[in-house]
Amino acid sequence: MLTLARQQQRQNIRWLLCLSVLMLLALLLSLCAGEQWISPGDWFTPRGELFVWQIRLPRTLAVLLVGAALAISGAVMQALFENPLAEPGLLGVSNGAGVGLIAAVLLGQGQLPNWALGLCAIAGALIITLILLRFARRHLSTSRLLLAGVALGIICSALMTWAIYFSTSVDLRQLMYWMMGGFGGVDWRQSWLMLALIPVLLWICCQSRPMNMLALGEISARQLGLPLWFWRNVLVAATGWMVGVSVALAGAIGFIGLVIPHILRLCGLTDHRVLLPGCALAGASALLLADVVARLALAAAELPIGVVTATLGAPVFIWLLLKAGR
């Protein structure tokens, strides 16, 4: 028994090391790739100082943090709602953040500062997450809870579409492209949003014990002495915060929070002591690679990263649904 535990521990360490190496390689590729390829040897030249340190580095850091936040949010929501299909985009949390941001643009007539828009996006995500938690407390089946989340997402999407369609504001019309997801406008001025993600990410990665209990189910977690009300509300707040900040930085990006935790679980990373940091590393790597594809796929324009993740993630999502139905 002890030998099996040690083997599992060594395997977990190997997975985390491999994911760390993958993330570092994706980070280097993101800094080098672009309209002009700049190798690491040229990073400290005047050209490298402009393109790498002033343009690509803040974007790369934002992609890394958002990818980690979305993947961890997916893992947390799947444990919290006891639903393997739960993730911020599918359950409408990302769209809720978008509604909050668009409401801020409308009410502020485009005059609100970026920090106020970010806070409104966070508030919108929190409201939708709290509504979902309210549904969860009514002991709905997992399929009904999933449908409730999808319905909330559709309502939020309809509200955003109506607002953009009837708006005469140039800023609001530009949000239509922004809501497809993209890091094109990220620079060092958004560093406060990046910093707002770091403490929550680190804190959640340290909460493996309550997450493992939640993954066992509500009854088992209560029998083990876990204060469910406290942890549900704290994790809801943390997840809403991460999703809101991510939407404020880059718009709505789907499938990262759904696919990454599933893939890692299929690889044997079921313990949240390994799953949570693994999701952070794998989510960051996946979004960094998707961002490189978004930048390089077209010569004269940049693809919205939400389109790239949806194109790559939708087939995986369908495969997971078929696999779960067997």
Curated annotation (Swiss-Prot):
One example of a Gene Ontology biological process annotation: cobalamin transport
Subunit note: The complex is composed of two ATP-binding proteins (BtuD), two transmembrane proteins (BtuC) and a solute-binding protein (BtuF).
Locations listed in the record: Cell inner membrane
Family named by the database record: Belongs to the binding-protein-dependent transport system permease family. FecCD subfamily.
Gene Ontology annotations for the cellular component aspect, listed alphabetically: plasma membrane
One family name in Pfam for this protein: FecCD
Residues annotated as transmembrane: 15-35, 61-81, 88-108, 112-132, 146-166, 184-204, 240-260, 274-294, 302-322
Native organism: Escherichia coli (strain SE11)
Protein name: Vitamin B12 import system permease protein BtuC
Any GO MF annotation of the entry: vitamin transmembrane transporter activity
Alphabetically ordered keywords of this record: Cell inner membrane, Cell membrane, Membrane, Transmembrane, Transmembrane helix, Transport
Topology of this chain in the membrane: Multi-pass membrane protein
Keyword NAD part of the UniProt annotation: no
General function of this protein: Part of the ABC transporter complex BtuCDF involved in vitamin B12 import. Involved in the translocation of the substrate across the membrane.
